[in-house]
Amino acid sequence: RPGGMLMNGIPSFRLEKDVVDAEIDILRELGVEFRCGVEVGKDVTIAQLREQGYQSFYVAVGLQSGGKLNIPGGDADGVMAGIDFMRQVNLHEKKTLSGKVVVIGGGNIGADVARTAVRCGAESVDLYCLEAYDDMPMGEEDRSECERDGITVHAGWGQTEIVVEDGKCAGIRFRKCTRVKNDEGRFAPEFDDSVSEQAECATVLYCIGQKVDWRELLTGTAVEFNPNGTVKADPVTYQTAEKDIFVGGDAYTGQKFAIDAIAAGKEGAISLHRFVQHATLTVGRNRRQFIELDKENALIPVNYDTTPRQRIGYNEALRRTFSDERVAFTEEQIKK
């Protein structure tokens, strides 16, 4: 089915699928044809598509691979990439979990996976991450919703080994993480091996970074790649070294939000249109260059409205279900 990560990677309690289906139906009405189950590079090549009359291509395959958990026992039964778990749940291939579950990763995806595991019937869900609690990549709302769902967060731990019994996951060991980044701000975690912890569990779902699985998609093209597997392209037009191939979304930027990929798609559409019309790709384009506000030195008037940010409510009847439990602001909140 069409929809990509919006359909297969994001839980329905975060983004209900009928919303995406409605948007896809609009595209169909506009004349867009969807061909699902086709692997470009294997079933058909870009060269063959050119022969069929296609003049330009936009590649937005995202970061579909969760990689491997490179620790002893990482290939045991019960150990799975979080993105693969989400795909199985959204495609209705997996709806139930039993026993205790450990989720590795303190980002937004880790939160989604942990909350989904709760809804799949896990006995308990514990989330471990390298960062200190206040430094976790996931936002404040995600942390609050994890706690609301009964998920226990263990901040400042790095996985070392899966405990395996009869080929199956029986637990996982951690060591204390004392530092995540070095003085230059680069990812270089440091650990205290004298402080360890072991968690009993039947399932480990790891969310520690995703990557692009290109397979044979761009074989035979002049497209160039970055060391992390993303594609090199013009930052304004998204044109690659292969002039009729454009790229966008996470396959170009690395892991970002869905809304960033959607915005890139709109700019990519402009480039595709100009390319097939033999027009300039650069004149009049939004270069997306912004100057960050220096909040520390901003002059705030004495009468500035200091009303705090309003928080959403929840429908208790939908708690721990796959329906979106969030509710709109009340009239009183809007008046504030």
How does the language model describe each region?
Residues R1, G107-I109, A251-Y252:
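Residue-level detector of alpha-helix initiation sites
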Residues P2-E29, F34, V89, A114-E161, ...:
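Rossmann-like dinucleotide-binding cores of NAD(P)H-dependent redox enzymes
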Residues M7-N8, V38-V40, V44, L97-S98, ...:
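Ferredoxin-like iron-sulfur electron-transfer modules
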Residues D21-I71, E161-R173, T178-K181, C201-L205, ...:
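Feature captures the FAD/FMN-dependent oxidoreductase FAD-binding
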Residues D25-E39, G66-C120, F225-A241:
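Glycine-rich dinucleotide-binding loop and its adjacent helix/turn
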Residues D77-S98, I162, N182-Q255, I300:
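FAD-site-proximal beta/loop scaffold in flavoenzymes
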Residues R148-G150, G158-K168, V180, R274-K336:
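Mid-to-C-terminal Rossmann-like scaffold of FAD/NAD(P)H-dependent oxidoreductases
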